[in-house]
A protein has these predicted regions:
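Positively charged n-region of N-terminal signal peptides that target proteins for export
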Residues: 1-5
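C-terminal motif of bacterial Sec signal peptides marking the signal peptidase cleavage site
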Residues: 15-18
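Bacterial signal peptide processing site
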Residues: 20-23
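Post-signal peptide N-terminal segment of mature Sec-exported envelope proteins
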Residues: 28-45
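Envelope-exposed proteins and targeting segments
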Residues: 47, 96-98, 148-153, 171
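N-terminal segment of the mature soluble domain
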Residues: 54-103
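Surface-exposed short loop/turn segments
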Residues: 102-162
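Short secondary-structure boundary motifs at beta->alpha junctions and helix caps
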Residues: 161-194
Length: 206
């Protein structure tokens, strides 16, 4: 379970790459909340937590502008959810029974599709004089487009289950979606999925 957060992120990336960007009517239809946890963890045994006041950002585009203006709002949503489940926030991480980290990933993705503009195979075979097959024709128009997706990852890290200076992630939640629309609409959708991560984790309580 030490690499639970990383495995979850990789799995999500593979899953979402098979879904984007077609098959839905609105950007909200692409929003998803995914959670995973250590089935051997006793979440009722934890009592206090600490959480940094900033989000760690990662991007696959070196020119991406990382905006921290919503850090406080996102961290507050995460903090409130843990408090609602009976945990107490402390300022000193050394006295906390678990640490909460929040990370954000931004990806520029490229996809394409081939437009089969001919009507049927009869048209294709009859296109070349004499009906002979020509390996270079007809031409299939290829459309290439880019879209930006983002993920906010919450990791719940036990401070008592360390070994070889490695931490143990006992719960992870990911809010994923397309980064389209106004900044406020994007943050509203992110917060909705963050809340959903906790809703679908009923075992996560003191």
């Amino acid at each position: 379970m030490k690499h639970l957060g990383l495995m979850l992120t990789v799995s999500l990336a593979l899953f979402m790459s098979s879904c984007y960007p077609e098959g839905a009517d609105t950007v909200e239809d692409y929003d998803v909340a995914i959670t995973n946890y250590d089935k051997g963890a006793d979440f009722s045994s934890f009592s206090t937590f600490a959480i940094p006041d900033t989000i760690v950002y990662f991007a696959n585009d070196k020119n991406a502008k990382l905006d921290h203006q919503f850090d406080e709002q996102i961290i507050q949503v995460v903090t409130d959810n843990f408090i609602k489940r009976g945990y107490t926030k402390v300022e000193n991480p050394e006295t906390a029974s678990f640490i909460v980290t929040v990370s954000a990933f931004s990806n520029i993705n490229y996809s394409y599709y081939i437009d089969n503009w001919y009507n049927n195979w009869n048209w294709y075979w009859g296109w070349w004089p004499g009906g002979a097959f020509n390996p270079y024709y007809p031409w299939y128009p290829v459309s290439v487009y880019a879209y930006q997706s983002g993920s906010v990852v919450i990791d719940m890290i036990s401070t008592t289950a360390r070994s070889d200076n490695k931490v143990k992630v006992i719960w992870s939640g990911i809010a994923d979606g397309l980064l389209q629309g106004t900044q406020q609409s994007i943050i509203n959708r992110v917060n909705t999925q963050l809340n959903q991560c906790f809703i679908q984790s009923p075992y996560l309580k003191k």
